[in-house]
Amino acid sequence: MRRVVITGIGIVSSIGNNKKEVLASLYKGVSGIVSSEEMKKLGMRSAVWGNIKLESINIITQKLSRFMNNASRYSFVAMMEAIKDAKIDREYYQKNPRVGLISGSGCSFSKNTLTSDIHLMKNKHISKGISPYLAVKTMPSGISACLSTLFKIYGVTYSISSACATSAHCIGNAFELIQFGRQDLIFAGGGEEISLELAMQFDAMRALSTCFNNDPKKASRVYDVYRDGFVISGGAGMLVIEELNSALSRSAYIYAEIIGYAATSDGSNIVVPSGDGAIRCMNLARKGKNIPIDYLNVHGTGTKIGDLIELEAIRKVFLNEKKPMISATKSMTGHGLGASGVHEMIYTLLMLKYNFIAPTINIENLEPCAENMNIIQKTTNIEINTAMSNSFGFGGTNVSLIVKKY
């Protein structure tokens, strides 16, 4: 089987809209969570979010953007950055059947869908006032459809949607297609729009943080005793994933080699993780116990139950060996939902490159179950050779990815 490496990254997130901004935020432990006046005005319980502010979105012309929802726009910017970062010539990736794209979103595009529903309720003439571009804007494969068209991708092109594990599945699938010789290079990632319409759905579930509306920077509290739910966010990320010899032939910079990937299902509960699925996933990605892990970027979202179940799963996986250093970057960024998997892989790659571990911020009273679990609470300068990133989602879907410094 062929070896697979990562040669380019692009990101739009609550802590920065490019590699330089994100690196600075990670190292300094900067929170991207802010107060939301819009959420307050609607009377939502939660009034904080990891907002996305993207001026460069204006580079997309009206002709291009009319089919795009915000997740597609974020993804367009991330892909432009990833291409530039990987130093790929247009002549190579365009119209090349050996170059593909796999990118998805974990949630429905609620902003466009709800706007359409409201229009239908208010108007008898349903054909009037609805955008002719709405079908593409709201279809689950909207991101991959728009990007593959705009960037002239000829290889495999489709979307995966698996809740908060979406973009991690996209990365893993790209890895396997290249590993088995189906493609030589794949753009892989995902995007999620941040909107009031989407936030309302999670607010109704009482899944969002509500106790820190007056102090938004402290609202995302993974592993703190007083955590009370996740903070919603969004954004996009894109990786350039490439066969090793292809990367070497063009003298590309290699962030890391992908050496492990697994995907499992809990098969037990829609919203409460079993823990068993996570254990099986991490063990499969590690191929038993053959791959030691220096650092683990946890899924950790700040929910009362989910954080503990993942920690217990990690404890069992590493029961008789050295535990990896652990941090939860969602404590800074909030939860990017379908974009979180690729976001956290990018954060992990930056830590590998610059030899540090970003902190889990906002731990004022460490959860007792997290004691002796090597939770990093302050930026730590240390060389990392091998790292794992976990992404889990509603429906009991689990992904573990392992990368190694090349």
From Swiss-Prot:
Catalytic activity: a fatty acyl-[ACP] + malonyl-[ACP] + H(+) = a 3-oxoacyl-[ACP] + holo-[ACP] + CO2; (3Z)-decenoyl-[ACP] + malonyl-[ACP] + H(+) = 3-oxo-(5Z)-dodecenoyl-[ACP] + holo-[ACP] + CO2
GO cellular component: cytosol
Entry coiled-coil feature ranges: none
Pfam families with a match to the protein in the record: ketoacyl-synt (PF00109), Ketoacyl-synt_C (PF02801)
A single GO BP: fatty acid biosynthetic process
Pathway info: Lipid metabolism; fatty acid biosynthesis
EC number(s) recorded for this UniProt protein: 2.3.1.41
Keywords tagged on the record: Acyltransferase, Cytoplasm, Fatty acid biosynthesis, Fatty acid metabolism, Lipid biosynthesis, Lipid metabolism, Transferase
Localisation per UniProt entry: Cytoplasm
Chief localization: cytoplasm
GO molecular function: 3-oxoacyl-[acyl-carrier-protein] synthase activity
Broad EC category: transferase
Subunit composition and interactions: Homodimer.
Name of the protein in its database record: 3-oxoacyl-[acyl-carrier-protein] synthase 1
Species in which this protein is naturally found: Buchnera aphidicola subsp. Acyrthosiphon pisum (strain APS)
